[in-house]
Amino acid sequence: MALMVKAEGGNGGKRWDDGFDYEGVTKIYVRGGLEGIQFIKFDYVKDGKTITGPIHGVSGRGLTQTFEINHLQKEYLLSIEGYYDISTGVIQSIQFKTNQQTSDMMGFNEGTKFSLRSMRGRIIGFHGFADKNLYSLRAYYIRIPATKSAMDGGQNTGRGYDHGGDYDGVRKVYVTFDGTSIRNMRVDYDKVGQVECYEYGVKIGTQNQFTINYPYECITSVGGSYADTQPYRCIVLRSLTFKTSNGRTSVFGKETGTTFLLESQGNAIVGFHGRVGSCVDSIGEYYAPFSPYPPPTEKLEGQGGDGGDSWDDGAFLNVKKVCIGQGQFGIVSVKFEYENDASEVVVGDEHGKATLLGYEEFELDYPSEYITSVEACQDKVMGAETGVLTMLRFKTNIRISPSFGLKAGFNFVLEKEGHKINGFHGKSSSMLHQIGIHVIPITE
């Protein structure tokens, strides 16, 4: 049965629907123009044959780009990202990701970002809204079955346990170790937003836990060791090591005997199976494609004066460069350089008034360096009816920038513990009145 993913994009246009009676998508056509994406068209696969879908939108002056998906090599479409203009509703750019590759961003990286994806699903059809341009996309998808691995550890002792592979992901793992062997395990799974738990073994020893930041993180591999162990007179697990998509690792027990590693490139672990008695004798996994959601961005309120017009660069993957323009009494303009999810450089607009002195720059050693806080000074100066910012200084995970401007009035700091800055907003006129930040959790 095909399930529907909610619409993404703007409002407007007439409804269209390609249906979902297909095995997958094999080619995508996107035509872009000055106002955004003019049309989109899909080639589908049905009974091994290519079915060409209709054009959704209108073909005007512009450029058509294509993206091919090789279904003969078991390639399938997983997700879509892009940007739309919130004022016109027209989709401005679009990018496609399969289990094997990612397309170029087609169109302009401007506007409000959207993402179209489903947990554990591959896209097999589309519907949406279009008129003279493309306004929104919806997708039909089917669930991708999990693949069952072999077991490592004792193969014949104890009794079997099998959680199956029908879960969306793992939320938490509890492991009990008695100083010699893994005695007990409990796994908390996520299934359509609900938690389901499995526990097996004998809870003797010290229990520790490992929490996964699902759905922004997944377990990508499980390793460990096993050995013939007394007094059980059989092979049992002596240690376990879990690794996540964010590079975090959690180790339980002591490595002894034969080591093993269970992982499948590009996949996440969504279930466990094996054998258990007085100890956990063996472990195996269920693998499935899993694309962790990007961490949610949080917009922190700006601080400073109330004058000027509001501006907002939005949120990006990271900040690459800060440009500061100074005047006689304070900061007159700022401009920021970002990197987006497609690893493209995005130069933000100039906020404030251009200065003949040009910009002073603070460039980050990206991607290892990122901004964690901004310190600023606010004061009321000649020629300004409300407070303006007279100084800015940026702190990263490595260093502190020089102070740009003059320390006057009172100062404030913008930051959130455990987060990094990935965008800026504020207010400006002929000077900078206010600054605020977008932040995301630090996962490195």
UniProtKB/Swiss-Prot annotation:
InterPro entries, per the entry: Jacalin-like_lectin_dom, Jacalin-like_lectin_dom_plant, Jacalin-like_lectin_dom_sf
Residues modified as N-acetylalanine: A2
A single GO molecular function term of this UniProt record: carbohydrate binding
Pfam families with a match to the protein in the record: Jacalin
Keyword line: Acetylation, Lectin, Repeat
Residue span(s) of domain Jacalin-type lectin: 2-143, 146-289, 297-441
Domain of life of the organism encoding this protein: Eukaryota
Family in the record: Belongs to the jacalin lectin family.
Descriptive protein name: Jacalin-related lectin 42
Originating species: Arabidopsis thaliana (Mouse-ear cress)
Phylogenetic placement of the source organism: Eukaryota, Viridiplantae, Streptophyta, Embryophyta, Tracheophyta
